Amino acid sequence: MNNRIEAAYEQRPRRWVFELAVALVVAALLIWSGTAVETAGTTQSGATIAWNILAGIFHPDTDLLFNFTTQGVPYLLLETICIAFLGTIVGAIISIPLAFLSASNLTPKPVAFVGRIIIMAVRTVPAFVYGLMFIRVTGPGAFAGLLTMSLCSVGMVSKMYIEAIEDLDVRVLESLDAAGCTTWQKIRYGILPQLMPNFASTAIYRFDINLRDATVLGLVGAGGIGAPLIFAMNAYRWEEAGAILAGLIVLVLIVEWISTKIRVKLARG
C-alpha cells in the first residue's frame, strides 16, 4: 500500500516549477516598479507642507467655513452637490433607452453590439479629459461640470443597467402574457418592479462617485469647490484650504451615510 501511495505521489504533476517561475516574475515586476518611482522632486520642505495642510484642517478658517455668501464654503459645497446631482439625473435618464437598445435579450445582436461599443467608447475617456473638452466648448463654470458628469454617468450607469435588464426573470413576463396582459401592463407589473430597485441603487452609487469627481473637475475650472481649494493651496493659505477640506469631508460623510441607507433599503425591498 505504501509503495503504491509513494508511486502515485511521484506521478503527481510537477507544478512547483511553474509556481516558482510565477513568483520570480512577480518579484521582478515589484522590484522594477519600485525603481521606476521618481523621488528626485521630493524636497526637504515637503514634510513641513504636509504638516501645514494637516494643521489647516484642524484649525480651519471659520469665517470662510461659515460664510454663506457666494464665496463661502456652504455655497461652494451646494454648487458641487448640484453639479453631481443634475449630472447623475441626466446621465441616468439617457442611460435607460441606451441600455435597452444594448441589451442582447431584447434587441438584435448587431444593434446590441453597436450600443455596447458606444458605451465602451464613452467609458474609455477619463472625466478629467471630458472636463477640459467641455470647458473649451462652454467656457469655465458649472455648466461644463454638468455636461462632464452627465457623459461620465452614461458610461458607467448604462453598463450596470444592461446587466440588470439581461437578468430579468422572463417567466414573469410569460405568466403575464398568458394572462392576457397588454404591453403596458407587462411593463408596469413585470419589468419595472424588477428593474427600478436596481436602477435607483445604481444611480445613487453613481451620485457618490460624481460628488467626488465634481470636486476634482473644479481644479480645471468646471465649477464646484475644487478651484477655490487649489487656489488656496497654491497661495499657501492653509487655513482656507483646511476650511474647504473640512466642509468637503463632512459633506462626503453625510452623503455616503444617506446613500448607504437608501441602497440597503432598496436591496432589502
Describe the residue ranges of each PLM region.
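N-terminal, non-cleaved signal-anchor transmembrane helix
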Residues: M1-I89, L101, N105
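Alpha-helical membrane-protein architecture signal
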Residues: F66, T70, P74, L78, ...
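Pore-lining and gate-forming transmembrane alpha-helices of multi-pass membrane transport proteins
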Residues: E79, I83, A227, F231-L253
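Hydrophobic positions within alpha-helical transmembrane segments of bacterial inner-membrane proteins
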Residues: A84, T88-I96, F100, S104, ...
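Cytoplasmic-entry segments and transmembrane alpha-helices of multi-pass inner-membrane transporters
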Residues: L98-G131, M160
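Generic hydrophobic transmembrane alpha-helix motif, especially the helices
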Residues: I119-S153
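Membrane-cytosol interface at the C-terminal ends of specific transmembrane alpha-helices
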Residues: P140-I191, P197-R206, W257-T260
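C-terminal transmembrane helix and the adjacent membrane-cytosol boundary/short C-terminal tail
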Residues: S201, G242-G269
